[in-house]
Swiss-Prot record:
The keyword Magnesium does not apply. This is Conotoxin Cal27. The keyword Transmembrane does not apply. One of its GO terms (cellular component) is extracellular region. It comes from Californiconus californicus.
Length: 74
């Protein structure tokens, strides 16, 4: 195999490893959400750094670091 082929193969391997690490980090960040049940108006508080995220029109939700599809319970 030529030197260029070896270099390209090595570069491809490094890119694949970096992509795998990024995907693993994203999965771990998602799993760090506590997923504890919470309620607005006197429900259990969420851990520090998390909000109580409720689906639209609901007063019960789950604790998450970011409310993607819902909104922070009032």
């Amino acid at each position: 195999m030529s030197g260029t082929g070896v270099l390209l193969l090595t570069l491809l391997l490094l890119v694949a490893m970096a992509a795998s690490d990024m995907l693993s980090s994203l999965i771990q960040a998602h799993e760090r959400d506590s997923e504890e049940s919470c309620k607005s108006y006197g429900g259990g508080p969420c851990p520090s750094g998390e909000d109580c995220c409720c689906p639209p029109g609901r007063s019960t939700g789950t604790c998450k670091r970011t409310c993607n599809n819902g909104s922070v319970c009032a």
